[in-house]
Amino acid sequence: MIYLDTSVALASLFDEPRKPATEFWAQAMVSSRLLEYELLVRFNALGTAPEAVGKARVFLEGIVLVDLDQPALARALQQFPLVVRTLEAIHLATMEFLRVQGLEVEVATYDRRLAETAGAMGFKLADV
């Protein structure tokens, strides 16, 4: 299963040159509910047309979103192998929560810091 980071979702939704190949999206996807907030806040901040916001909502329907619960948020407050920012910490804590639940994920991200820290934590990186 692929853990989808916001950087890859935005690249796809904004049709950037570095977006993943079409076949990438055939895989099962999971992410933190944080993804929903990051995407919709970004779209709203840009004053994006309602149709584009609707496209983002449809995009999110294809992804299993893990709620931001207290254990994951508490883990995000703890130290990671490398220095991370708040949103990265929440994504990493969610990935760790999934691993504890027995679900191994590959991380799809364009965020260098997130990729390096996820790798240091033993997560595989998806080819995006």
Region spans (language model):
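Short glycine/serine- and small hydrophobic-enriched flexible loop segments
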Residues: V41-A45, E96-F97
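Short, well-structured N-terminal submotif of metal-dependent ribonuclease cores
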Residues: M1-L35, F43-V58, F123
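Short hydrophobic/aromatic patches at helix-to-coil boundaries
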Residues: K124-V128
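Active-site neighborhoods of divalent-metal-dependent phosphate/nucleic-acid chemistry enzymes
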Residues: L65-R113, M121-F123
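Short linear capping/connector segments at secondary-structure termini
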Residues: A56-L60, L73-A76
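Short, charged, low-hydrophobicity "junction" segments
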Residues: G47, E61-V66
